[in-house]
Amino acid sequence: MEYIKPHKGFSTLIILGITLGIDLIFSLLSTFINTYIVLRILEIFIVFFNIYQLYYILKSLTLKYCYDNENFYVLWCFGIRRVTIPFKEIEAYNVSHGEIKGVKLWGYGRNFFALGTFSVNDIGIVNMFVTATKNVIYIKCNSSIYGISPEKCDEVKNFLEKRKLVLKNWTYEKRNKVSLSKDRHFDILIFLISIVILMVTIIPFILYLRGVMPHKMPLSFDSNFKPMIYGTSREFAFKHMMYGAYNMIIFFCIYYSAYFYARYSKKLAYRLMYISFLVAFIFLIFQFKIYVTYIH
């Protein structure tokens, strides 16, 4: 197994700086926010944000390349995560220098580094493992394209050429519009999100119509879940119906965004739908906490 050292740029420092900056902004904002549901959503966002950031910091720090007689490997997270690229599936390779010309679909960087999924001009949809954009090698396979940034670019070019792989440009054929209507994974996500939003919207009305709620119900809470404003059970039901409406708006926006991203990658479309599910689920948990506390 031969190892190739990636060109280490400033990717780790940039991601770490963004992480600390966003965490600082959140800490400052949290001192001024006194609304329970808003603060809980922000707290959950910052938890997932820091997990996301930590993943890319580890990816940047631990990324390395290697190869044997059969495959080229991209390793990160201490070898726990890897991509295997069989040489027999490689069709060609290309080289670029400097800023990535294209659109970031998911991940980090563009100017100085690129980690994640990018739509690169004249190349295609690329899985980027690039810690510095000084020298980027694009490896085109049967069904995927990968971007790497070796410290010694000529070394990689030489062993690719020894395997009779040529340096050439290729035509990027844009994908046709992707239909998600028959995608089982996508359909399950839509079903789950719809059920959660329906529960957020309908359950308060059912409880109100059945007379289960007390006449006086809290309408808003401070950051410690202490009621700030009280109203009638009818006002409570209508207020939470509006929460359901807000979630429907978020869902439809994300739904159409998912169709756009599906042209590049279905995985990106799924991730967007999970965001909608998470937001709706937070509102549902918030409601159940109110029911448990104030309905006896």
Swiss-Prot record:
Give the protein's recorded name. Uncharacterized protein CA_C1301
Q: Which GO terms describe its cellular component?
A: plasma membrane
Keywords for the protein's UniProt record, in alphabetical order:
Cell membrane, Membrane, Transmembrane, Transmembrane helix
One Pfam family assigned to this protein is bPH_5
Topological relation to the membrane, as annotated: Multi-pass membrane protein
Location (main, coarse): membrane
What residue intervals traverse the membrane?
A: 10-29, 36-58, 112-131, 188-210, 241-260, 273-295
Where located?
Answer: Cell membrane
